[in-house]
Amino acid sequence: MAKYNIVEKKQKEAVYRTLVSPKMMDEMKEKILRVIVMEKKYKDKNYSAKKLAEDLGTNTRYISAVVNVCFHMNYTSFVNKFRIEEAMAILVDRRYQGLRMEEVSDMVGFANRQSFYASFYKQMNMTPREYRLQQLAQHPLERVAKPSKKTAKKS
């Protein structure tokens, strides 16, 4: 069965490569990264592949092709990757220690806590809570909120 999946995946990638020229693939990859990462559209719960395609003046089939070939994952996994990365930073930042997981989930763009937990576990092989506890135990004094400029001047 595993052999079948590998062959199927290679065939799918080959079809995508014929759909989009290499030059257009590179250009679209950069545009997708700019919008999703630099403009932080991953934080928008409602920012779909369809909306991204509209913003880039293309269609979802091209978006899907570029994401699959260039990033080796589907659109949802691609967006969730950046959400999880931001969540990881928030979870260990002492300024946000009072936040509930629902609030962290909302801040990074997940529709609900369940999808946040499922995506986090899939990517990190532990729950967000386990990650927070592990990181804080390993680095107890790091990630303390930086003093404000007012406080720093008085010292």
Identify the residue ranges that each predicted region occupies:
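Short, polar N-cap/turn motifs at the start of nucleic acid-interacting alpha helices
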Residues: 102, 112-113
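Membrane-proximal linker segments that couple transmembrane helices to downstream signaling/catalytic modules
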Residues: 2-94, 98, 102-103, 119-122, ...
